[in-house]
Amino acid sequence: MAANKPGKEAILAAFFDEGSYSPLFTDGAVSAAFGCANGQSVYAVYQNGEPVGAADLDKTTRVLKMAAETGNPVVTFYNSTGAKLEGGLELLNANSRLTAEIARISGVVPQVAVVTGTCAGTSAVQAAAADVCIMAADAELFLTAPFNAEDKVKAAGSAEFAAKAGVAAIVEEDAVKAASAAARVVGMLPANNLAGPAVFDFEAPAAALNLVKYDAKSAAEAIADAGSLTELYAGYGRNIYTALGSVNGQAVGIVATAKGTLCHKCTAKAARFVRLCDAYSIPVVTVVNTEGFVKSEGDDQAGGIRQAARMAGVYAEATTVKVAILAGEAVGPIYTVFAASADWRIAVDGCTVAPLAPETAATVLYKDEIFASDNIQQATKQKAAAYKAEQCSAVVAVANGAADAAVKAADVRAAAAQALDMLATKRTTRLPKKHGNITL
């Protein structure tokens, strides 16, 4: 380990509450501890940078089983130069058991991966399978060593690359700050899938929702408690903002669209985040204001349609509390995907809720009048504006069942908080089946 790299004691001290943790296993390349992080009981597995053997992997598997049995989160700190090759097939078997256990307890207790050094091969798969993957800026994460890859890509294997690929949810300056971020995330999540959501002291945000100067992050900040937001996947799908936070002290997940168009990365990001929230019954508040899906054959080829279908399926399948805030453009498939399956839909004065964009609808409905005009462009704008005012407003959306409440922008936070309180005891059942077959 380089002299300027933080060691085990510094990293665990940043993760656990002061004086709260006790070691469980101390020998070998992997050690473990149990304590409290941000007030939450949690297990930690720590790789010390040495090659891991079968016994080290089985030790990790045992901690995961203990976490599931006791209903507590588990955080794994990844930093290993590889595997002890003399372990042979027993090493392969131990790695297989660990990978299977990670999948088995997924959705039972939160799993957080913190990559502080090198995380390669099967370990990279295991880290990416966690609910949240956090990396130090100087850490490495890769399946195949970048210098062995046939197609050389700039910054491959780096934390920056992992963030752009949608693998790393958070990237911090160093391992100590990454550990602190992990403690923050663990504190936002419930202990397990049967525990209630976390509750916090709170202060109201400084500013209300502003539709004129709308941007995704500001919209989320206007709804969440002051200083409560922890953004996930900031480097991926930048036209959607996803963050864990709280509203009136209750933990929530917030999804907010930017006003631009949504590509396949944006929809994949939202689907991943909503699925995390649903696994642990964290309410989801979605702020909708976007021009729609990106018009691009290239994006379709990259999975645009498939990822949009995936996101629609994740939202529809989620049984957690879902509140949609229609804060601007919510037209056609955007409304269908983000708002149709919500338990409560709040339309903000000035929003546009419609099956088609007003300009498109006007050219169809008023075709003869528009073409009879001396100025087709101006006539189209006038008819579109009239159609928007008469057919697409918040009040009309409520009257026609496309929304449940119409509010002013200044009252959005209060309306969202009221909806969350009203729906807090929501119970729902699913049809008996093995699992759905949404696109992945």
Where are these regions (language model features)?
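Ligand-binding clefts of soluble mixed alpha/beta catalytic domains
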Residues: M1-L440
